[in-house]
Amino acid sequence: MYGKQKTSILFFAFSFLFFAFSQANAQNSIALLKYGGGGDWYANPTSLPNLIKFCNSELQTNLEVNHPTIEVGSSEIFLYPLLHLTGHGNVVFSQDEATNLRNYLLAGGFLHIDDNYGLDAYIRREMKKVLPECDFVELPFNHPIYHQKFTFSNGLPKIHEHDNKQPKGYGLIYEGRLVCFYSYECDLGDGWEDIEVHNDTQEKHIKALQMGANIVRYVFMQ
């Protein structure tokens, strides 16, 4: 009984911290999530700065271009309403990290996962540690995340070919709330990068930024 009471107390304490801090920082906060396992969490170094600049221009946000990098197990994740995770391969969350991320999501936080190719099997395994009661479900094309400032009637845009599969947007929904959006076979982050990095067309670059802006607006307007 004591263990359950202690867990509840910690959860509500984290919830209070999240809401208290997010009210003060929500206008200028997106964080890159650093994780273990070797799956290059640091991929796409120009992607978030470019997305933030685009949002500041198109959505009139006031986001800090010099975004923070936060470890999964850090209490600092509760300062940021939106976390971004990317990479190509293995992802490993310790049990403490999984619990920390779970508390963050249940307290109102949001996680965007962007498969930079090769992330799928690992992130699905690790997110089961975080929300074992939830499965990734493909979001319908009429979901509000595709219809913010920019309309994507067919869901995620295809930015990079990879396995030539259709891009899919998956979600983890906890008690009716979308807490995690997972962009798969799309590679939004590569599309956000400086054009010369991947030699993307201007059209793909803009489409990727527009979809990213939709995610940001969806999170900040919830």
Which role does the model predict for each range below?
Residues V65-V72, S94-T99, N164-K168:
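Alpha-helical scaffolding within the catalytic cores
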Residues F11-A20:
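Bacterial N-terminal signal peptides
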Residues Q27-S29, K34-G38, T46-S47, D120-E196, ...:
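An acidic, glycine-rich "communication" segment
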